[in-house]
Amino acid sequence: MNAPVTPKKLIKGALGDWEVVIGMEIHAQVTSRSKLFSGASTAFGAEPNAHVSLVDAAMPGMLPVINRECVAQAVRTGLGLKAQINHRSVFDRKNYFYPDLPQGYQISQYKSPIVGEGEVLVDLPDGETIRVGIERLHLEQDAGKSLHDQHPSLSFVDLNRSGVALMEIVSKPDLRSSEEAKAYVTKLRTILRYLGTCDGDMEKGNLRADVNVSVRRPGEPFGTRCEIKNVNSIRFIGQAIETEARRQIAILEDGGWIEQETRLYDPNRNETRSMRSKEEAHDYRYFPDPDLLPLEIEQAFIDGLRTELPELPDAKKARFVAEYGLSAYDATVLVAERASADYFEAVAKGRDGKAAANWVINELFGRLNKEGHGIEGSPVSAAQLGAIIDLIADGTISGKIAKDLFEIVWGEGGDPRAIVESRGLKQVTDTGAIEAAVDQIIAANPDKVAQAKAKPTLLGWFVGQTMKATGGKANPAAVNALLKTKLGIE
């Protein structure tokens, strides 16, 4: 169960506080080479209608054949969500007319989905963790795409996407703020990517969200909900929820009532607008598809997939904290993407985990974000970053030189140790050379020397001047020790 609603999750209205209640329906495109009921390719970016089988085009007499891999991907996802896998599920026809739906119905699952109840643990930015219930997961066909910008007076239909497998993942109405909703979608996308069941690419439409929003006074029954369709970015999800909640509050405080309807979010105008009245199940006239037998899944099939599951984000985070001594925050950052977690582990192998995490999060991620690269496009390999950390650990270079070395490797590549040798970047550990630099700084600043005993914080200034004089190559520990002795600072 979620914790009681705190004031920070309430929305201030003109006539008091309101609570927003949010449920999510995530449409995740299944990662598979072919479609749910045909052998046509699912490859993105092809010419219109290049990947359309006779089944996808609803030619008379064409019968659907279930794709075993799509079923396996749905089961893997269910297992990753700690959900009940149903041994028997049924495909139904969901009847409605739309130009990009050539059959006149969508093959979906209604009363008997492939996956039942589960849950997702969601870490919020403030450190709180909430538990979001999963109501169900079912398989269904995607529709095609209507193109309205190809001709001044005609619309065209591209059926490349028609029949592609989707998983619709329905949450319980457990979310209470836009921040919770964004964090939930982010976590769910991470789990899907770890499992390899959906790439989560929202720009390509491979992950889309329908957001159900209602408002109520704290402690009162649920209000009437509106569904915001096809929100295609996490940022827009947050904005759509905030905008829709404010719209509903304004209506209710003005004495009106909320009509249950489907709405669209316009990010350019930051508003939701009515699309159509919200359909009920009976409007779609669901009935079992007579061309498809009920789907029977054996326990051995489920168990086999369970043994193949990768280590998922929550388990990996717990292991990083226990094994490497990381903070919960650092571990959360590192496991957000599977590739990032793998990179960190390669860097940390045989080294201090905290030092590795510090370099990966602060230096590498900071630079990647600045340059707009993902971890896969990092110019600095895990082996190279590990070598830089080794050079610090064995005293060959200082932390300051290490940052300069990181920049060199980022821009030019190469072996870090060889670069240190060839460019003379080794840390000065010769006490005599360091002492000469220290003596020179002390001799040049008698006024500060006189103040140092009474003001020990001046030690930092002397250290900085000495490091500057040695080009950052002096061993910081040796510099500190010498200065403390010569300045008489305890």
From Swiss-Prot:
InterPro entries referenced in this protein's UniProt entry, alphabetically: Asn/Gln-tRNA_amidoTrfase_suB/E, Asn/Gln-tRNA_Trfase_suB/E_cat, Asn/Gln_amidotransferase, Asn/Gln_tRNA_amidoTrase-B-like, GatB, GatB_C_1, GatB_Yqey_C_2, Gln-tRNA_amidoTrfase_suB_CS
Alphabetized GO MF terms: asparaginyl-tRNA synthase (glutamine-hydrolyzing) activity; ATP binding; glutaminyl-tRNA synthase (glutamine-hydrolyzing) activity
Top-level division of the source organism's lineage: Bacteria
GO biological process: glutaminyl-tRNAGln biosynthesis via transamidation; translation
SUPFAM superfamilies recorded: GatB/YqeY motif, Glutamine synthetase/guanido kinase
Keywords linked to the UniProt accession: ATP-binding, Ligase, Nucleotide-binding, Protein biosynthesis
Any single Pfam family the record assigns to this protein: GatB_N
Reactions catalysed according to its record: L-glutamyl-tRNA(Gln) + L-glutamine + ATP + H2O = L-glutaminyl-tRNA(Gln) + L-glutamate + ADP + phosphate + H(+); L-aspartyl-tRNA(Asn) + L-glutamine + ATP + H2O = L-asparaginyl-tRNA(Asn) + L-glutamate + ADP + phosphate + 2 H(+)
EC number: 6.3.5.-
PROSITE patterns the UniProt entry points to: GATB (PS01234)
Record carries keyword Phosphoprotein: no
Known partners and oligomeric status: Heterotrimer of A, B and C subunits.
Family: Belongs to the GatB/GatE family. GatB subfamily.
Stated role: Allows the formation of correctly charged Asn-tRNA(Asn) or Gln-tRNA(Gln) through the transamidation of misacylated Asp-tRNA(Asn) or Glu-tRNA(Gln) in organisms which lack either or both of asparaginyl-tRNA or glutaminyl-tRNA synthetases. The reaction takes place in the presence of glutamine and ATP through an activated phospho-Asp-tRNA(Asn) or phospho-Glu-tRNA(Gln).
Protein name in the entry: Aspartyl/glutamyl-tRNA(Asn/Gln) amidotransferase subunit B
